[in-house]
Amino acid sequence: MDFTNREVYLKSLKDIKEHKINVQPSLIYQLLIKVNEFENFTSLIVNFDSKIKDIDKFNQLFNRLKNGEPFEYVVNEASFVSLMLYVDNNVLIPRVETEGLMNIVNKIIDDNKLNDSTIIDMCTGSGCIGLYMKYTHRNSRVIVSDISKEALKIAKKNSENLNLEIEVLESDKLDVFLKNHIKCDIFLSNPPYVERKEDIFDEVKKYEPMNAVFVENNDIFYEECFKHYKEVMNDKFLMAFEINYDQKERLTKLIGKYFTNDDTKFLFLKDIFGKDRYLIILGGYDVNYFEMWSWKSNWYYKKRWFSLFSYWNSFWFRLYC
């Protein structure tokens, strides 16, 4: 039997309402766009009363969605700022918080003219951070690393799909850069930082890779980076991390332990939900445009210079942390 897109939409909408299934109606539209291979929402509306291209495929995807599988895994796509990435359950779905980190990093890069830099993205997952850096700074050398072979396959796939050239290394330790004599100007990372499993939503536990979310001790990774920063960073450098909301005090002490130069400065920034989420460390730069505290000289100055992304069309981290 043939069904129009309108009929499929109304039937699906009735299904989720009658059975009280937690699926946003807008996702039904997006599934229809995907199945019909339309370019955008306008194309769907124009063809709303036309026959759906593949009702069996729609039903298969819709059933996965009703079972609680994240939409990005169902359609194998996730948007990240201005990029569209392939994702599956071997990698974490890119989050709006990481988009916020990109906004901050690009502001610092532009203000300090770091466009021709060597950039490391550690714990890359889908490659979202490294690929966005390459997309916005085409003359930079970008190296991404991850301990997961499957994640690296996806990062490579996204690199090819986007026609963005990056280098890929398998490791979650700094030694891979030391062995390859790689030093960088910019070091970025969104490592696993959740310690308590009760802090995570069921759909994350069920579908997303736990090694990309959980860690036994969420300070160890950062301490390793701080301890060996002189071996992997050039004299002038930027380091930027996503962190857990409760790490600020502990990381401040670690920074004071390992960064002993007067010209090394750092600050913590909040995400759009008001939680401490970003750590920025700058070495060798005369920074004078945003709130920062130097642990040694104990000076600071203020200027609010960035605004984080609105999140009405973005995917929340699904963590209570």
Residue ranges and their predicted role:
Residues P191-F221:
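Mobile active-site "lid"/loop adjacent to the S-adenosyl-L-methionine
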Residues V287, E291-W299, K303-L308, W312-L319:
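Cationic, amphipathic, low-complexity alpha-helical segments enriched
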Residues G100-K197, F201, E224:
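Conserved SAM/SAH cofactor-binding pocket of Class I
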Residues Y86, N217-L282:
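Conserved Class I SAM-dependent methyltransferase catalytic core
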Residues M1-F58:
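A short N-terminal interaction module
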Residues P94, G125, I272-K275:
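Short glycine/threonine-rich catalytic loop with a Thr-x-Gly-x-Asp
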Residues I33-K107:
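Conserved AdoMet
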Residues T4, V8, D54, I147, ...:
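Soluble or luminal CAZymes and related metallo-dependent hydrolases
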